[in-house]
């Protein structure tokens, strides 16, 4: 290298050549984990039109999940089918407060074999911007659950029609992920 590159080269990291990654290993890593924020984080908040990573998500373990096994197993089976590339239905969990609806969804991030799953929490105020989020996520190999907690609508609520259009389908095709 030319001498003028000396100061620059001196500050570059020194990589050990003893265990290089093969192209196949790198490909498999990015296929399984995504890239950028999706490689480093599994839970996100959709806030003001941006994905914000959740550094320490509150994901209860299996030992904390008591009762409602039938319902939880259906959610797990539906999510597993999505991760396997099958078409799946949207899921609506309803019930009394404290019955584990939110915990059931958050627990999915702790399950073995669900490493390609990412969870994105969307507040009711962000529903109108949901098509933009869906376009952002479309085409990626990872699978996403859009999690809307404590959803309630007033009679004249405009966010209801935005969600209804997304759930029932509009002109844009729903991405497979």
Which stretches of residues belong to each language-model region?
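Short loop/turn elements that form and flank the Walker-type P-loop nucleotide-binding site
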Residues: 86-88, 115-116, 140-142, 173-176
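Conserved catalytic/switch belt of AAA+ P-loop NTPases
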Residues: 135-139, 154-177
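Well-ordered alpha-helical segments embedded in enzymatic catalytic cores
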Residues: 74-78, 129-133, 162
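AAA+ P-loop ATPase mechanoenzymes
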Residues: 1-70
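Pre-Walker A (pre-P-loop) alpha-helix and adjacent loop at the N terminus of AAA/AAA+ ATPase modules
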Residues: 57-91
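AAA+/P-loop NTPase substrate/partner-engagement loops
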Residues: 111-144, 150-156
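Walker A/P-loop nucleotide-binding motif
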Residues: 85-105
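A conserved segment at the C-terminal end of the G1
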Residues: 106-110
């Amino acid at each position: 290298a030319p001498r003028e590159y000396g100061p620059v080269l001196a500050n570059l990291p020194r990589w050990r050549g003893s265990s290089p990654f093969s192209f196949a290993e790198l490909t498999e890593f990015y296929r399984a984990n995504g890239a950028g924020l999706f490689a480093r984080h599994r839970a996100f908040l959709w806030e003001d039109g941006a994905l914000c990573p959740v550094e320490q998500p509150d994901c209860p373990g299996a030992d904390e999940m008591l009762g409602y096994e039938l319902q939880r197993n259906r959610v797990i089976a539906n999510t597993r089918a999505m991760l396997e590339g099958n078409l799946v239905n949207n899921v609506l969990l309803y019930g009394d407060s404290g019955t584990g609806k939110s915990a059931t969804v958050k627990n999915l991030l702790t399950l073995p074999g669900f490493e390609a799953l990412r969870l994105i929490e969307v507040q009711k105020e962000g529903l109108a911007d949901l098509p933009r989020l869906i376009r952002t996520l479309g085409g990626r190999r990872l699978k996403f659950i859009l999690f809307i907690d404590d959803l309630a609508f007033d009679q004249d609520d405009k966010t209801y029609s935005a969600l209804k259009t997304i759930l029932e389908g509009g002109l844009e095709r729903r991405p497979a992920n």
